[in-house]
């Protein structure tokens, strides 16, 4: 079965590596054009391109599929299936119609929940106890195609979105291999999504970063976890701006006003929330490095 793979970031590279190691016939790889990276602004290859070149696979990097020449280039590869993982482009119908067995996608949520570009982050932000990945067919509507299979995993109580993504990449890669194997054997069934149950996971932005201490400790903790490693929750402590990298939930103090410092322990700085409290374990002052909270405040003592 001839497979064309489309993807860009690390999660996609993990999936591509998995199906190549399984001996699948990948006849072409599509990824985003090379982009300037870091201060040097040198063009950098995507993680998927790195894997493809290491396996001597042809790489295609169109800006879009508006040009007929670009569509014909894909058609010439004669794919039986197109497998898409975090490609970063919406495929037009004329592309979806090319592969005989269809275009499939690995989406990092349990659809129909969290359709959109930041599914695993929103699962953490929303305080979900479990999430997973869905193998699905692509259609014109975003993340609304028929489902093929899912794989579920619990979310750790202190797990960040970044840590969760690392695990979902492995789970998604295994699900992609399983799905392609089943497609080759003609064993795939389609299950329509219940759109009435759909929720959406829009892109994150920095307006979401400031912590509102009137929220519950659980909500603050979920915000810190869900916005890590980007864009990272923020707050001011005694006039200094901080990025907050890690928290845990701790018992509150009755009558304490939200945002009040309850104390500095051996493990972190405890702050009252609207309900309960959190202990900041790791933070980063503006212009500084990430540090354990006790280490920072040892060098920058709190005001009485």
Question: Which ranges hold each PLM region?
Answer:
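N-terminal Rossmann-like dinucleotide-binding module
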Residues: 1-42
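Short beta->alpha connector loops
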Residues: 8-11, 63-66, 87-90
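Conserved beta-strand segments of alpha/beta enzyme cores
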Residues: 25, 56-58, 102
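N-terminal glycine-/serine-/threonine-rich beta1-alpha1-beta2 phosphate-ribose binding loop
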Residues: 36-78
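Acyl-group handling in specialized metabolite and lipid biosynthesis
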Residues: 202-215
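Donor/substrate-binding cores of folate-linked one-carbon enzymes
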Residues: 21-22, 32, 81, 85-200, ...
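A residue-level signal for conserved active-site and pocket-lining positions in enzyme catalytic cores
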Residues: 7, 29, 52, 82, ...
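An anion-binding loop in the catalytic cleft
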Residues: 214-304
């Amino acid at each position: 079965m001839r497979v064309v793979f489309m993807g860009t970031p690390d999660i996609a590279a993990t999936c591509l590596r998995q199906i190549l190691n399984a001996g699948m016939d990948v006849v072409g790889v599509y990824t985003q054009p090379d982009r300037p990276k870091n201060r040097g602004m040198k063009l950098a290859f995507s993680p998927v391109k790195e894997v493809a070149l290491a396996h001597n696979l042809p790489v295609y990097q169109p800006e879009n599929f508006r040009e007929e020449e670009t569509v014909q280039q894909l058609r010439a590869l004669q794919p039986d299936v197109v497998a898409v993982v975090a490609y970063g482009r919406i495929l037009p119908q004329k592309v979806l119609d090319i592969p005989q067995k269809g275009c499939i996608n690995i989406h990092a949520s349990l659809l129909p929940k969290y359709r959109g570009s930041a599914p695993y982050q929103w699962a953490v932000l929303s305080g979900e106890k479990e999430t997973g990945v869905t193998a699905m067919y692509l259609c014109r509507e975003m993340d609304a195609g028929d489902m093929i299979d899912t794989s579920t995993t619990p979310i750790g109580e202190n797990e960040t979105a970044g840590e969760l993504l690392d695990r979902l990449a492995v789970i998604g890669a295994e699900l992609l291999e399983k799905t392609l194997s089943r497609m080759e054997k003609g064993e795939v069934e389609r299950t329509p999504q219940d759109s009435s149950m759909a929720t959406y996971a829009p892109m994150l932005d920095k307006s979401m970063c400031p912590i509102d201490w009137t929220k519950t400790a659980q909500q603050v903790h979920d915000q810190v976890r869900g916005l890590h490693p980007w864009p990272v929750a923020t707050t001011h402590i005694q006039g200094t701006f901080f990025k907050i990298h890690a928290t845990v939930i701790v018992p509150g103090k009755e009558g304490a006003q939200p945002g009040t410092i309850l104390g500095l322990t051996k493990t972190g700085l405890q702050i009252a929330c609207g309900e309960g409290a959190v202990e900041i374990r790791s933070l980063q002052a503006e212009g500084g490095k990430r540090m354990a909270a006790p280490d920072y405040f040892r060098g920058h003592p709190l005001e009485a």
